[in-house]
């Protein structure tokens, strides 16, 4: 764990359950006050908020579909009203559903594009008025954006690769504003609810052949990487998190 302080910093995390909960608690332990937004998982977001509040942090929970520009603007307005600023934006909203090439439908493209591309773009663009020089944006791409592919996830891979491209392109425009943007490119971290345990173990085995590790170790490394990126003074980076298996 990095021994630095985020006291006085306001962090917006899109997605307050699963890995989002671990990240929120990790940032709260360093002193950050939090904004947790959710689309459907209110209970999980509230549970995360309770954990952060027990650490003495101020937490706001907001319902927000990050793919909807109007909804994102409302969330930004609430953040401005309550906190006046935003120091760190962590973009975690994601879907991970298998679909073979022959069975891809228009809806598969639409859902992946909405969540990964629009759901990354709108919070960044609309939050900029609240962000001062020295602020940080942390997006989540995928290891396939910079390394080996795996079958059965084409819409996911294409749209997550777009997040990596967006990160590098935005870094050029945000540089003069003094705002840093970087992306994490992880392998599989936590099993999605709609994937069987057998399929999940197959995905993990293919991803971590060189370094067999537990889900707990993977999650902690993800949390630690997010924390590190809250302090870096570089921008446009794509940080692999796959334990060397590119």
Question: Where do the protein language model's features map onto the residues?
Answer:
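Catalytic loop of short-chain dehydrogenase/reductase
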Residues: 138-162, 167-176, 188-189
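C-terminal substrate-recognition "lid" of short-chain dehydrogenase/reductases
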Residues: 130, 218-242
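Canonical Rossmann dinucleotide-binding motif of NAD(H)/NADP(H)-dependent dehydrogenases/reductases
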Residues: 4-35
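A short, exposed helix-loop element centered on a Lys and neighboring polar residues
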Residues: 124-125, 168
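Conserved Rossmann-fold SDR core element
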Residues: 27, 87, 164, 174-189, ...
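Substrate-binding pocket helix/loop in short-chain dehydrogenase/reductase
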Residues: 100-101, 108-113, 203, 207
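A glycine/serine/threonine-rich, flexible loop-to-helix segment
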Residues: 176, 183-211
